[in-house]
Amino acid sequence: MSTTNQRPGVTPREVAPRSIDRGVDIGHVHLKTADLERIKQFYVDILGFDVVFRMPDALFIAAGGYHHTLGFNTWESKGGTPPPPGTTGLYHVAIRYPTRATLGDALRRLVRADYSLSGVNDHGTHEALYLNDPDGNGLELCWDRPQSEWPLDAEGHLAFGNRRLDLAGLMAEGAPSEEVDSAGHWQPAHRA
């Protein structure tokens, strides 16, 4: 038996009859795209991911030296349209940032590019920005609070919340000092 099954965490509300090893995680997500250049402009030029491999009909991007965090291809979807509402499929992919300051940087990048958010939330466990990529794929850009700060009920189960996110504070978090006014609000030096 692996010792990773003993890693601390929240108490599950339902335990699988034969639980998977707790060290298992999602390695990457591979998505269909209608237009590789358009998707590259968003993920690389705006969000700042690095291109690690490219083929005429596929693009692989990553952060932090990983082989690829996200893959995109036009094998079955070149020029295609997103699935219509009311169909099953991907709701969103969460891209987790290591610090609140790096999530603030992502928010500032989106603002500079005039890219719209569909929602923001403080879930107690993490702060989240919601948006759709150019192909309509749902994204959650998020930063996890330390696990010791996650809200739990009396039985140790997660108690997710939907609190108002301090967007102004997040915008200013980690911003260069010359871009933060005396009230602590981010004032962009320029827009892209």
Please provide the spans of the model-predicted regions:
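Short, flexible turn/loop "capping" segments at secondary-structure junctions
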Residues: 19-23, 84-88
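A detector for short, charged/polar N-terminal pre-domain segments
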Residues: 10-20
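Core segments of cupin and vicinal oxygen chelate
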Residues: 21-23, 31-76, 192
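Vicinal oxygen chelate
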Residues: 31-37, 94-150, 158-180, 185-192
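Eukaryotic nuclear low-complexity, Arg/Ser/Gly/Pro-rich intrinsically disordered regions
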Residues: 2-12
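Short, charged/polar, Gly/Pro-enriched secondary-structure boundary elements
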Residues: 67-71, 80, 135-140
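Short coil/loop residues immediately preceding or within conserved phosphate-binding loops
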Residues: 26, 56, 90, 126
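Conserved catalytic-core motifs of GNAT/GCN5-like acyltransferases
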Residues: 50-57, 142-152
